Amino acid sequence: MKVISNFQNKKILILGLAKSGEAAAKLLTKLGALVTVNDSKPFDQNPAAQALLEEGIKVICGSHPVELLDENFEYMVKNPGIPYDNPMVKRALAKEIPILTEVELAYFVSEAPIIGITGSNGKTTTTTMIADVLNAGGQSALLSGNIGYPASKVVQKAIAGDTLVMELSSFQLVGVNAFRPHIAVITNLMPTHLDYHGSFEDYVAAKWMIQAQMTESDYLILNANQEISATLAKTTKATVIPFSTQKVVDGAYLNDGILYFKEQAIIAATDLGVPGSHNIENALATIAVAKLSGIADDIIAQCLSHFGGVKHRLQRVGQIKDITFYNDSKSTNILATKKALSGFDNSRLILIAGGLDRGNEFDDLVPDLLGLKQMIILGESAERMKRAANKAEVSYLEARNVAEATELAFKLAQTGDTILLSPANASWDMYPNFEVRGDEFLATFDCLRGDA
């Protein structure tokens, strides 16, 4: 980590804790800043705030009092989940207080080069794939960012010989100014998080910030399956490397069932360790990064063939009586579930879906539901999901929660069938996050296996 003096004796407000806020507070304190943390969770229910107080960091909990900004802060570090129309943020902007993001703070002190991965779907899987391949090739890749390891924490142990492989959400990118990865990947762009950004155009603009400071010596890897990529590619200074499952491109591509990089065959699609057309896209993006990083073809192929997926992201959980279970709780929109379904035989598939609708067009899912053996539907979006099932002429049952849905699916399943949790909706109507939803699926699998 570079020791910089930019924040020495500067009064800085951390707005919102969670993992990233806690990490930013500790990093800034190490850099000599005068840190105040403000979090909406009450102090007696806030272990992170309690721990920071024990380290001598000022904490204010229970609300976000706007008058706190009268204390002449010189910077604000905003939690990514707090929108820019929050009264505290609006007041800070009105007072012309610079607002930093936690990932940009990490960038300022990083000795290690950064590979940044963003997109609507596939971020975590691609980030993990890239780190696995780089490490298998003898490099030192450190996972960081939106994948659960705050960048401002990981950067403190990173040295110049490491590489930070950083998953980045639109929330994290919307406020960056100086952030510059050496390699950036945009997996795809679909209308998600519109409740936060307001429009698809603003959402894309946030994602596009990943390349704002890149130059021709940097590499931007784009999904050539999407028309928007061609439009965006014209506006970047970075060297663009495309990937595609639909056509031969001057980068990574799928042709006759083989994944290539610039005419060099790397691996057969059937040899990939995870199913689904979306995972072919993830693997192509990974191949592009790996080749730019000097990893040998045989190592790339071996690593991708053994890659077993990421928890909650088309995760192969196991089998009970030759019935296979997959946990894809991370699929919180239609596109993610469409891509998950592409990897299975619908006639042997029982799909568990439903949750909180965040503006999905459920008719878009109908072609992918055709021929399904059964659906188990749950959540706030149940009526809309049922209409889609009816249009696809798929029979369905309703469940009160994921546990009940999994039990119902298992009762209906026969030898050789697959049970897939791929909700196509957010989790917040029933669960605090997709991880808790997926964990309930995993726990139910364990119970069913124990009873079998």
From Swiss-Prot:
It catalyses: UDP-N-acetyl-alpha-D-muramoyl-L-alanine + D-glutamate + ATP = UDP-N-acetyl-alpha-D-muramoyl-L-alanyl-D-glutamate + ADP + phosphate + H(+). It comes from the Bacteria. ATP binds at G119, S120, N121, G122, K123, T124, T125. Keywords: ATP-binding, Cell cycle, Cell division, Cell shape, Cell wall biogenesis/degradation, Cytoplasm, Ligase, Nucleotide-binding, Peptidoglycan synthesis. Coiled coil: none annotated. Its EC number is 6.3.2.9. The keyword Mitochondrion does not apply. Gene3D superfamilies: Mur ligase, C-terminal domain (3.90.190.20), Mur-like, catalytic domain (3.40.1190.10), NAD(P)-binding Rossmann-like Domain (3.40.50.720). It is found in: Cytoplasm. Pathway: Cell wall biogenesis; peptidoglycan biosynthesis. SUPFAM superfamilies: MurCD N-terminal domain, MurD-like peptide ligases, catalytic domain, MurD-like peptide ligases, peptide-binding domain. GO terms for molecular function: ATP binding; UDP-N-acetylmuramoylalanine-D-glutamate ligase activity. One of its GO terms (cellular component) is cytoplasm. It holds the Pfam family Mur_ligase_C. The keyword Transmembrane helix does not apply. GO terms for biological process: cell division; cell wall organization; peptidoglycan biosynthetic process; regulation of cell shape. Belongs to the MurCDEF family. PANTHER family: UDP-N-ACETYLMURAMOYLALANINE--D-GLUTAMATE LIGASE (PTHR43692:SF1). Cell wall formation. Catalyzes the addition of glutamate to the nucleotide precursor UDP-N-acetylmuramoyl-L-alanine (UMA). This is UDP-N-acetylmuramoylalanine--D-glutamate ligase. It comes from Streptococcus pyogenes serotype M12 (strain MGAS2096). The lineage of its organism: Bacteria, Bacillati, Bacillota, Bacilli, Lactobacillales.
